Amino acid sequence: MPGLYATPTAPLPFLPGVVVRSFVLQRGTESTLIYNSPGIDAAADEIRALGEPSHLLMNHWHEAMYGPPKLQVPALVHQDDRAHTEASLPVDGTFTARGWIGKDLDLEVIPTPGHTAGVTTFLWDSGEHRFLFSGDSIWVQGGQWKVVVLGDSNRADYLNSLALMRELDFGVLVPWGAEAGAPCFDVVTRGQARQRIDALIERVAAGSAE
């Protein structure tokens, strides 16, 4: 899609058949990275060609398992995930509330705790599409939207965050992980997004982990 670029993939160690990647948002004369993954260094030259990256925006601390990229870029994560992140990856700044990245008001930071305490979703308006970077909070498996409720996840927070995401205006869901060989994003209408998130809310409220 215009303005959105995906890095090469890397396997998710604890979930066979699932890969992760980072995304590059071309925003004027600079670029912004979403999600940490080995793909950043694999595509370092291509990323620089799109404009020197201003930030690496991390959805949650699990992304730190791959360590810091060699590409020099300030890493930001939510304050509530900072301690876990810094065990593996230096943090240059934190989010604490809903707000914007940069002056153009095109990239919004939206805390959506649940999967971890500091999960942060990013909503980007490219001018042509509205992308929701949902991390692991919502991903696609077998063509179906799913959640990832872990043993240490907060189910009540997760439900509140799903309700918040249901009201966001977006047309492209972009998770961190995807099945190997499957598309890395899902294009939907606003009605479809609401319907699918309603189904997630129902399942999580009933005790489902996915």
Q: What do these predicted regions represent?
A:
Residues P38-K103, Q192-R203:
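Active-site HxH/HxHxD metal-binding segment of metal-dependent hydrolases
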Residues P2, A6-T9, F14-L15, E30-L33, ...:
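Metallo-beta-lactamase
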Residues G17-V19, F95, T116-G118:
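Residues that act as N-cap/strand-start positions at coil-to-secondary-structure junctions
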Residues S22-Q26:
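Short, surface-exposed beta-strand/loop micro-motifs that present aromatic residues
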Residues F14-P16, P38, D92-T94, R155-A156:
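Short gly/ser/thr-rich secondary-structure transition/capping motifs
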Residues F14-V20, A42-A43:
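Short N-terminal binding/cap micro-motifs at the start of the first secondary-structure element
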Residues V18, G102-L105:
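Short, solvent-exposed coil/turn segments
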Residues R27, N36-G39:
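Conserved beta-strand-loop surface patch within small alpha/beta domains used
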